[in-house]
Amino acid sequence: MGGAVSAGEDNDDLIDNLKEAQYIRTERVEQAFRAIDRGDYYLEGYRDNAYKDLAWKHGNIHLSAPCIYSEVMEALKLQPGLSFLNLGSGTGYLSTMVGLILGPFGINHGIELHSDVVEYAKEKLESFIKNSDSFDKFEFCEPAFVVGNCLQIASDSHQYDRIYCGAGVQKDHENYMKILLKVGGILVMPIEDQLTQIMRTGQNTWESKNILAVSFAPLVQPSKNDNGTPDSVGLPPCAVRNLQDLARIYIRRTLRNFINDEMQAKGIPQRAPPKRKRKRVKQRINTYVFVGNQLIPQPLDSEEDEKMEEDSKEEEEKEHIEAMKREEPPQNLLREKIMKLPLPESLKAYLTYFRDK
């Protein structure tokens, strides 16, 4: 599934293509997509395919096409502070993007059938927190993943504001999924080859809308234990943040607001995402000559052709040099503010999430 937009050269180029094709339509979703590099969720040796609008699978690891994730993120209508359940959370790519929108007071849970994929997702999550330049630009709701079959969720589990299922749902499992949703919530899942948005408008009332024709592998049916019944799966608890964690959130928020106020006072605009420069297609100019009664196109002589190519290369090189001059070295102003605080080094490290940059 995929192939709806052109391949990108990098993550920003891919996002530009998704915006141009109207798969990404809101700024909040765009920011989340730009913050998480899709290529980071690919295995080494397969990253060349990361910025194509194609699904990717290697063993148990699977990523849907970017156009699918775009439609899902838009259809979920995410807001800060909501609770989210990802059924078939896979690599954690989608859950991490969702966490950037939910913010620190949301709930972000995922259930995945394969234990090796859960470990992979945890590794990628840790790498994002420790290494990503985007982490300090957001308040983050860290995903929590559990291993299990999403058709075996314990009957006393809590309900969620937003739910996504990343596998094909049979019609007889539709009501099972709906039970997990709060009144006023939104469920997005593939049913009968249609990505469908379902809104719970009341205790027993629903509104459904087809979003996109899709092709998903079906949900894996639960296996039974020795007693002939499936084991139930417990979802992560809805834990309340401790005082230390809350203090870190509010200190970072205060410093971030202070930085924004400083920049506004100095008239420094917030840097917008770079507009990707499209590669120009060179057009060869032809001359025309009469041969008999026919007008035949003839290419320009090779010397003029070569001169055009040389001029084009020189122009591109000049533009590249100018762009390099304008490019500012990356600055992490939040980290700089934290490191200047009159606090013990151990507390500064905690405030930076023990990041090295």
UniProtKB/Swiss-Prot annotation:
Residues with a covalently attached lipid (N-myristoyl glycine) = 2
Q: Name one GO molecular function term.
A: ubiquitin-like ligase-substrate adaptor activity
- The ranges of region (BC-box) come to 240-250
Keyword Cytoplasm attributed = yes
Region (AdoMet binding motif) residue spans:
85-94, 160-164, 181-191
Alphabetized, the UniProt keywords read: Cytoplasm, Lipoprotein, Membrane, Myristate
Q: Where is this region: Disordered?
A: 299-331
Q: How does this polypeptide assemble, per the annotation?
A: Component of the probable ECS(PCMTD1) E3 ubiquitin-protein ligase complex, at least composed of CUL5, ELOB, ELOC, RBX2 and PCMTD1. Interacts (via the BC-box) with ELOB and ELOC; the interaction is direct and stabilizes PCMTD1.
Give the protein family.
Belongs to the methyltransferase superfamily. L-isoaspartyl/D-aspartyl protein methyltransferase family.
Question: What's in the domain note?
Answer: At its N-terminus, contains L-isoaspartate and S-adenosylmethionine (AdoMet) binding motifs. Also contains an extended SOCS box motif, where the Cul-box is separated from the BC-box by ~90 residues, within its C-terminus.
Listed name of the protein: Protein-L-isoaspartate O-methyltransferase domain-containing protein 1
Query: Which organism is the protein's source?
Result: Mus musculus
